[in-house]
């Protein structure tokens, strides 16, 4: 039997064992997800084996890490550094690289040598860097007088003479193999060190690995307790998988969770009315209309809405969000932002605002790129974000 045949049998057999383990340990839906992902990844890996055969021991090791990583999710927990370094990160790198190499696998299927297939893995290697490292930045957002007919991108504008509202937004950290407790803790420490007026957390704190114990998220967010009274949060879709754990961890860090609630905060900028919207899969228009009726605008207060999913921005009643802060999309996670182009997977295939500054009417939306990873194995071309937002109000607040 040839080396290629042995690799093919081993890859597809290991994938089948992982799916069986996933079904027994976590149920049918997770097994289907893993089965689809590993089937696609495995077929591409097998198709490209002959091209990479000169380095087959490395290629086989990387394929094994993919299967081991997804098998470990059957008993999901935060793994030690040695496991992440030798299994999880290599496995996610190889899974991303092989899926990015799909065009070369198609070429190979037609009997053409897939020249330059290694480029997909160079891109995936850069994706690892973008997934585990963030660069601090400062962003000016001007709330201007313009009235915009429909949801669309909007210029950030320029800084004004008046003192801006200073906000640090943390969103979608997704504690897991690419976001350790230590890394999220450092992000929180740097947020506190910037001495913002507000720190706003817009959801999706966990992955399957970090749902094992509340102490994981508690330890990660602990530095935020230093700014008690200035730190608020709303829930994301993944937070509903372990709501009691998330609530407990936020309370431990002195973070006030707003679930369809408001908070009024006095800041050096002036009074701010904060609205925290719960995440809803259905009935979002009715939900946001009811929330706006329950908490009408307070005169003279800047109205800031924490809304995890930017796709719901269009359902917010008009003039009810001077500034809406969202996450959820991870900035598109796959895109060309690194090359200076605005296109991402989300913007190409959906109408959902994916990253940056948007407008509708006089309402403004900022979509944070997030710090973590979920879904596709890595960030590719869309760097994580760790920013200080300086909000310049250049119009009268009702």
Task: Please tell me what each predicted stretch does.
Residues 1-136:
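Non-catalytic terminal accessory segments
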Residues 111-153, 167-169, 178-180:
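Canonical alpha-helical transmembrane segment with a positive-inside/aromatic-interface signature
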Residues 142-398:
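Soluble catalytic domains of enzymes that build or remodel membrane lipids, polysaccharides, and related
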Residues 107, 119-122, 138, 184, ...:
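Hydrophobic, well-ordered secondary-structure segments
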């Amino acid at each position: 039997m040839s080396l290629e045949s042995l690799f093919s049998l081993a890859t597809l057999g290991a994938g089948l064992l992982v799916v069986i383990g996933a079904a027994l340990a976590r149920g049918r839906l997770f097994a289907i997800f893993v089965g689809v992902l590993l089937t696609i990844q495995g077929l591409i890996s097998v198709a490209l084996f002959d091209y990479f055969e000169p380095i087959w021991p490395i290629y086989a090791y990387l394929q094994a890490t993919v299967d081991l990583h997804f098998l470990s999710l059957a008993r999901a927990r935060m793994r030690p550094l040695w496991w992440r370094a030798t299994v999880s990160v290599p496995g996610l790198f190889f899974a991303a690289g092989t899926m990015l190499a799909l065009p070369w696998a198609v070429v190979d299927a037609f009997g053409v040598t897939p020249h330059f297939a290694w480029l997909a893995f160079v891109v995936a290697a850069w994706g690892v860097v973008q997934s585990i490292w963030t660069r601090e930045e400062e962003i000016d957002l001007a709330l201007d007088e313009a009235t915009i007919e429909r949801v669309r991108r909007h210029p950030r504008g320029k800084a004004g003479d008046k003192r801006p509202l200073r906000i640090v937004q943390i969103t979608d950290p997704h504690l897991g193999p690419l976001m350790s407790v230590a890394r999220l803790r450092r992000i929180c420490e740097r947020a506190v060190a910037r001495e913002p007026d507000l720190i706003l957390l817009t959801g999706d704190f966990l992955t399957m690995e970090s749902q094992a114990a509340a102490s994981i998220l508690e330890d990660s967010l602990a530095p935020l307790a230093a700014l008690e009274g200035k730190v608020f949060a709303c829930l994301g879709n993944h937070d509903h998988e372990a709501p009691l754990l998330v609530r407990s961890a936020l309370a431990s860090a002195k973070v006030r969770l707003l679930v369809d609630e408001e908070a009024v905060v006095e800041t050096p900028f002036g009074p701010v009315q904060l609205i925290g919207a719960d995440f809803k899969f259905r009935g979002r228009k009715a939900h946001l209309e009811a929330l706006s009726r329950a908490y009408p605008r307070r005169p003279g207060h800047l109205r800031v809405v924490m809304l995890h999913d930017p796709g719901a921005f269009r359902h917010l009643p008009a003039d009810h969000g001077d500034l809406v802060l969202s996450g959820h999309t991870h900035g598109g996670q796959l895109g060309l932002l690194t090359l200076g182009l605005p296109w991402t997977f989300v913007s190409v295939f959906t109408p959902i605002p994916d990253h940056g500054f948007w407008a509708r009417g006089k309402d403004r939306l900022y979509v944070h790129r997030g710090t973590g990873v979920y879904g596709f194995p890595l960030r590719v071309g869309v760097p994580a974000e760790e920013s200080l937002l300086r909000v310049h109000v250049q119009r009268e607040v009702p």
